[in-house]
Amino acid sequence: HIYIFNRKISTTFDSEKQYSVIQEAKDNMKKHLLCLITTILIAASLNAQPNYNYEKLQRENLGRGVVAIRKDASTVTVSWRYLSSDPMDTGFNVYRNGKKITPEPVNAGTFYDDSYASPDTATYEVRPVVKGKETNRKNGRYTLPANAPTGYIQIPMQKPANGVTPAGDTYTYSPNDASIGDVDGDGEYEIILKWDPSNSHDNAHDGYTGEVLIDCYRLNGEQLWRINLGKNVRAGAHYTQFMVYDLDNDGKAEIVMRTADGSIDGKGNVIGDTTADYRE
């Protein structure tokens, strides 16, 4: 007799039939083994996931981030930020010029379309609501300027003056890379903008490049500072990247970039040797 898995499968010997039964048993064993391996791999992958303590993760201390943009001639879209510290059941009341314009708290999103056709200035305020009561926890405001453009926010910028290289070639400036960060700790993002000269290029090309400038602006266009990387930092995508983040967790974002002798910080201080010139 032949037994497989303690089951009697034959009392007479037939070579072809017995071969078929044995092959079937092997196939079943392969299936069981494959299932076992798959189960082990899934369990291992789950155990490999880090166990985060989200209470200890560094977070930016951000405000409500209210912004109002004219959607069309008769509508203004108001948007704001839902914070990680907000209760899950938080709703929001929206006010225009001190008058509530939402019939009930907005709880299905963080934006609201206001029917407002006047070209005049309008101040919007967003107040969080929990269990039917305004908490006044991190209310946010934004003033829509008069005759605001449709579809975007207009931010005035201080374009640098044209420059001239030692070879006598004139260059101009244009906005290039940008990032965001709360540099002053007020809970709202500022814009960090790089001005790139028109003659920027990498070391595969000879010749001079203009000085790279980096500005910081509020959304209303107020310029907080300007950094000049100086003549010893070549202008080009390979050399003038920068990073913005609150690296030391003091509530204010830092900016990290390459500098050299002659670079000027946002307060007008010159770094290193003011007379050094490494371009030759």
Q: Where are each of the predicted segments found?
A:
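Bacterial N-terminal signal peptides
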Residues: 35-44
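Positively charged n-region of N-terminal signal peptides that target proteins for export
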Residues: 26-32
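Beta-propeller-forming repeat regions
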Residues: 59-61, 73-75, 82, 87, ...
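Proline/serine/threonine-rich low-complexity linkers at boundaries of modular beta-sandwich domains
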Residues: 51-60
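Solvent-exposed loop/turn segments flanking beta-strands in beta-repeat/beta-sandwich domains
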Residues: 83-97
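Boundary at the C-terminal end of the N-terminal hydrophobic targeting segment
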Residues: 46-50
